[in-house]
């Protein structure tokens, strides 16, 4: 399965590694683009914009948000929704 993951902090990066280690293709985006480059070195698929992340996912998209809870999540969802289709899935994995 190919999944999208936004947020490559400690939790997001380790979740991406775990998914990769279990056979999933992981498309990653982070506002700090250097973290995307590092993830690419670990075999993940880098995306340098939200639009690029969405385009790299096929079929029913699954996008996991690993950004801090609160306004960051709300802002990210408001940017993502116009790019997605009706049956795409957003998972909020952020915590406070």
What is each PLM-predicted segment?
Residues 1-65, 83-88, 93-94:
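NAD(P)+-binding Rossmann beta1-loop-alpha1 motif at the extreme N-terminus of oxidoreductases
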Residues 66-79:
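Beta-loop-alpha module in the N-terminal Rossmann-like domain of NAD(P)-dependent dehydrogenases
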Residues 70, 95-96:
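Short, surface-exposed acidic/glycine-rich loop or hinge patches that mediate macromolecular interfaces
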């Amino acid at each position: 399965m190919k999944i999208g993951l936004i947020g490559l902090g400690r939790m997001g990066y380790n979740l991406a590694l775990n998914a990769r280690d279990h056979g999933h293709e992981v498309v990653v985006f982070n506002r700090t683009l250097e973290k995307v480059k590092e993830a690419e070195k670990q075999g993940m698929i880098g995306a340098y914009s939200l639009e690029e992340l969405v385009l790299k996912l096929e079929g029913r998209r699954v996008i996991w948000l690993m950004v801090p809870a609160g306004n960051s999540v709300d802002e990210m969802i408001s940017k993502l929704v116009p790019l997605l289709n009706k049956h795409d899935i957003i998972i909020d994995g952020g915590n406070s």
